[in-house]
Regions:
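Beta-strand/loop-dominated core regions that host nucleotide or nucleotide-derived cofactor-binding catalytic loops
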Residues: 2-58, 62-119, 124-127, 133-178
């Protein structure tokens, strides 16, 4: 049987979402608290349909069938952080770096974020923390990664990597059909 490109990609993505199970709010309350703390938000998901799943080596929290949180490896161990869809849904005001227009095509292909492209960053950001990268002009999220330097250092860099990218618009997690 032949599928069009979109249908075949959808089937492949659905097969990679593993161990998907509904969970009660009380069983993931601590995860939700840590997820909110990571970006300075107080998340209230008590009325939402919550699921846990596994996708390409990462544990996910699905809220109303949309992957909004992921468990990732950082310099300090493992941490919960919003996915790009989570950033769009919750609009956090912490842990961000803003890039100029020239960096966008590279980030959309999964490249690490270079310091020269970062013009603004959250000053409270420390090396080793998770960071979401946004478009300087529109504020739209583009990628999520681990900061290699502090927020102040990012804005002063003229060369070298500032963020190691983990998840970006267009990757398999972004394209995941749930």
């Amino acid at each position: 049987m032949f599928f069009s490109g979109t249908q075949s990609q959808r089937c492949v993505s659905e097969k990679r979402l593993r161990r998907r199970t509904p969970v009660r709010h009380k069983h993931v309350r601590e995860v939700i608290r840590r997820l909110g703390e990571s970006v300075g938000l107080d998340l209230d998901l008590a009325e939402s349909f919550l699921e846990k799943a596994h996708f390409e080596g990462r544990d996910l929290i699905l809220v109303d069938r949309v992957p909004l949180g992921m468990h990732v490896e950082t310099g300090d161990g493992r941490s919960w952080f919003p996915t790009l869809r989570g950033v769009i849904a919750w609009q956090p005001e912490r842990c961000w770096a803003a890039v100029d227009h020239g960096a966008i095509p590279f980030l959309m292909n999964g490249a690490d974020c270079m310091g020269a492209g970062i013009h603004l960053a959250d000053p409270s950001l420390q090396a080793g923390e998770l960071v979401w990268i946004r478009d300087e002009e529109h504020g739209k999220p583009l990628a999520i990664g681990v900061a290699l330097v502090s927020g102040d250092e990012m804005t002063e860099m003229t060369n070298g990597k500032a963020v190691s990218t983990l998840h970006w618009v267009g990757d398999d997690l972004w394209e995941l059909e749930t």
